[in-house]
Amino acid sequence: MRLKDKIGIVTAAGSGMGRAGAVRFAKEGAKVAVVDLDGARVDSAVKEITAAGGKAIGITADLREDANARRIVRETANEFGGLDFVWNHLGHPGPASVEGIDMADFALAVDLNLRSQIVTTEAALPELKARGGGSLLYTASTSGLQGSQFSPVYSAVKFGVVGFARALAKRVAKDGVRVNVICPGATDTPMLRVFVARPDQQSTQGRDPEELVAQRAGQNPMGRPARPEEIANAALFLISDEASFITGAALPVDGGTTA
């Protein structure tokens, strides 16, 4: 087992890539805190993990609140006796347009994609250092590696995630903490359907979300969306000791989109 007896947190783990990751990590021997805003999804993911013989707790939390971003670390460490890794997977597409920008949606994109992850990191670092090191993983996007004309705000915050992680990697390497970023391309999740059909994206109004998903996914060289499990596989590698000499990396898992 690649994560035997490791203790970790996965945010936005109620569905999609986050859930696939939490389930996979538990199968590899980790004790996992499943964090999501949706309590029903949290319960469902925990049941899936425990039914397969894994160990998990569920934490329902709105990570826009700094106190909650810290609480998930405290509750995980108290329940399992420490912390070895965090996958900061939470995200929000934000506004599609800068013209007439919805500033509340802009603030939400910053809070969920960047601020909450920094606050969770602040809380997690002492726990990781106390165990001699660990792994921090962040979800950015291909939009955090190359600008997206359809999502300038999303690109901005995801570039911020990549920049933060790379800088932090240099700062905490001496403490045995590795810091990496995973950059998915179009992935077959509920989030993708929200992303392609945002109400302020004029070109998509009135179109079938499934048609939009197929169109977006077909733009990569492999001609299909990623499966959540494929993103989880890459996350597992970066979190595990198999990536023991990898830090400060931003790994595209995108079917060749950024090649």
Which residues make up each language-model segment?
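Short, small/polar-rich loop/turn modules that mediate ligand/substrate recognition or access, typified
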Residues: W87, A173, R178, I246-G248
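Residue(s) in the substrate-gating loop at a strand-loop-helix junction
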Residues: S141
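C-terminal substrate-recognition "lid" of short-chain dehydrogenase/reductases
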Residues: R2, F80, I118, M222-V253, ...
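Substrate-binding pocket helix/loop in short-chain dehydrogenase/reductase
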Residues: S97-V98, D102-V110, R216
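Active-site helix of classical SDR
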Residues: T121, V157, A165
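Alpha-helical segment proximal to the catalytic Tyr-Lys
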Residues: P126, K170-R171, S244
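Conserved glycine-rich cofactor-binding loop
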Residues: I7, G14-G16
